[in-house]
From Swiss-Prot:
Subcellular location(s) per record: Vacuole
Name recorded for this polypeptide: Patatin-07
Taxon lineage: Eukaryota, Viridiplantae, Streptophyta, Embryophyta, Tracheophyta
Organism expressing this protein natively: Solanum tuberosum (Potato)
Glycosylation sites: 115, 202
Signal peptide positions (record): 1-23
Main location: other
Domain of life: Eukaryota
This enzyme's EC code(s): 3.1.1.-
Short motif (DGA/G): ranges: 215-217
Length: 386
């Protein structure tokens, strides 16, 4: 009798634990964030291809796509382009690009996008080919048609304010329902590299609304992870599915943040003695790189600290290569040789440990993430069927 009683107690304890785990998975909000970095977008593209392949394997579904698993996908600059590629619908209302299509896209179009215009005084590239290929690939698709919530940043140089394109903002600000092609060019229009982008939409009253936009990195400084999280948090006010992360309850947040690599040579290149003699011109050449590196580091530090304090460190994964050298550090070197090197960087990164304190490789961590994403999707699907 005692044995039977003990077995029943153990059974109900397991059942309660399982139910609790299921509830957490069901309520979990999933976020994917992709950094900016020009042609270095090849690195996160390799990571996305691996992750999507794992999701297809886990769910035994070759048609599985990243947009099926993430509640919010955000990006800036080249990360904004990747966001659009994996969330913009085709004629069958499925993502027009699989993750495996992204690297070939860079190889086909990168050399034409980063084709020096020959201008000494203007931007390095005229942006015409970039706009042409965006219009060709994304067509007339607008923000509201994205297959999941998106968060793509830009900066308006006329109003001096950041502009964040998301589906959740459209009810209050319908003028933000811009074409994805305009948004992608705008978030990639880095000052000195591409010309700023002008376009117009209509307000709810039918009035003309003008945009004068440059690179989203000006607004979010390359790493859009916090922006993507804030969009997910704001959605909690309107969508019951997001209620679990209200008041920044990161325990129910599953965040994957992909970097485009940092320059290991940068810190070694300059010393205090050397820079003490610098003037405005020398500082202008490196200040943006310094600011982006510092901001990206602080974003990762903040998120890591928050998740660790909540004992939810496995819910956050930052995938970043911190040892880029030579031509791979350049955002606009679209030579075939350099792109091949970037592919190698991405593939080698999968085999590297997540950190000095965590021997788990990125490949292993992404497999774990894929299982969580798959389980959570199944739990939600089962709930919806009742």
């Amino acid at each position: 009798m005692a044995t039977t009683k003990s077995f029943l107690i153990l059974f109900f304890m397991i059942l309660a634990t399982t139910s609790s785990t299921c509830a957490k998975l069901e309520e979990m909000v999933t976020v994917l964030s992709i950094d900016g970095g020009g042609i270095k977008g090849i690195i996160p593209a390799i990571i996305l291809e691996f992750l999507e392949g794992q999701l297809q394997e886990v769910d035994n579904n070759k048609d599985a796509r990243l947009a099926d698993y993430f509640d919010v996908i955000g990006g800036t600059s080249t990360g904004g382009l990747l966001t659009a590629m994996i969330t913009t619908p085709n004629e069958n209302n499925r993502p027009f690009a699989a993750a495996k299509d992204i690297v070939p896209f860079y190889f086909e179009h990168g050399p034409h996008i980063f084709n020096y215009s020959g201008s000494i005084f203007g931007p390095r590239y005229d942006g015409k080919y970039l706009m042409q290929v965006l219009q060709e690939k994304l067509g007339e698709t607008r923000v509201h048609q994205a297959l999941t919530e998106v968060a793509i940043s830009s900066f308006d140089i006329k109003t001096n304010k950041p502009v964040i394109f998301t589906k959740s903002n459209l009810a209050k600000s319908p003028e933000l329902d811009a074409k994805m092609s305009d948004i992608c060019y705008s978030t990639a229009a880095a000052p000195t590299y591409f010309p700023p982008h002008y376009f117009a939409t209509n307000t709810s009253n039918g009035d003309k609304y003008e945009f004068n936009l440059v690179d989203g990195a000006v607004a979010t400084v390359a790493d859009p992870a916090l922006l993507s999280v804030s969009v997910a948090t704001r959605r909690a006010e309107e969508d019951p599915a997001f209620a679990s992360i209200r008041s920044l309850n990161y325990k129910q947040l599953l965040l994957l943040s992909l970097g485009t690599g940092t320059n290991s040579e940068f810190d070694k290149t300059h010393t205090a003695q050397e820079t003490a003699k610098w003037g405005a011109l020398q500082w202008m050449l490196v200040i943006q790189q310094m600011t982006e590196a510092a901001s990206s580091y602080m974003t990762d530090y903040y998120l890591s600290t928050v998740f660790q304090d909540l004992h939810s460190q496995n819910n956050y994964l930052r995938v970043q290569e911190n040892a880029l050298t030579g031509t791979t550090t350049k955002a606009d070197d679209a030579s075939e040789a350099n792109m091949e090197l970037l592919v190698q960087v991405g593939e080698n990164l999968l085999k590297k440990p997540v950190s000095k304190d965590n021997p788990e490789t990125y490949e292993e961590a992404l497999k774990r993430f894929a299982k969580l994403l798959s389980d959570r999707k199944k739990f939600r699907a089962n709930k919806a069927s009742y």
